[in-house]
Amino acid sequence: MYAVIKTGGKQYRVSAGDKLKIEKLEAEVGSEITFDQVLMVGDGADIKMGAPLLRGATVSATVLNQARGDKIKIFKMRRRKHYRKSQGHRQYFTEVQIGGITA
């Protein structure tokens, strides 16, 4: 069984037991969270689709970790003008493990 959930402005296809890195959520490590924005649930040939969301469908998950991603470097430059600007960014994320899907 799998589901398509929406969180942090992105959509993820998840199954029970999957580990997932999503945009940062305000939750303690080890706590149980519930995703109620479920777009689709599938089990073999039986597929339920929402318009846009499925009513009563939820996906439960456990928070494994709160961390920051790898550093990306932003570098702007104008040729021949001696203009250089460098900046770095590390995005916060939450790592979760999908527990169960109810439809």
UniProtKB/Swiss-Prot annotation:
GO CC terms in record: cytoplasm; ribonucleoprotein complex; ribosome
> In Gene Ontology terms, what is a biological process of this protein?
translation
Name the PROSITE patterns on file. RIBOSOMAL_L21
Q: Which domain of life is it from?
A: Bacteria
Tell me the keywords, alphabetical order.
Answer: Ribonucleoprotein, Ribosomal protein, RNA-binding, rRNA-binding
Q: Which GO terms describe its molecular function?
A: rRNA binding; structural constituent of ribosome
Q: Which InterPro entries match?
A: bL21-like (IPR028909), bL21-like_sf (IPR036164), Ribosomal_bL21 (IPR001787), Ribosomal_bL21_CS (IPR018258)
Please describe what this protein does: This protein binds to 23S rRNA in the presence of protein L20.
- PANTHER family membership: 50S RIBOSOMAL PROTEIN L21, LARGE RIBOSOMAL SUBUNIT PROTEIN BL21M
Query: What quaternary arrangement does the UniProt entry report?
Result: Part of the 50S ribosomal subunit. Contacts protein L20.
Family listed: Belongs to the bacterial ribosomal protein bL21 family.
Q: What is this protein called?
A: Large ribosomal subunit protein bL21
State the species of origin: Thiobacillus denitrificans (strain ATCC 25259 / T1)
Q: What is the lineage of its organism?
A: Bacteria, Pseudomonadati, Pseudomonadota, Betaproteobacteria, Nitrosomonadales
The gene name reads rplU
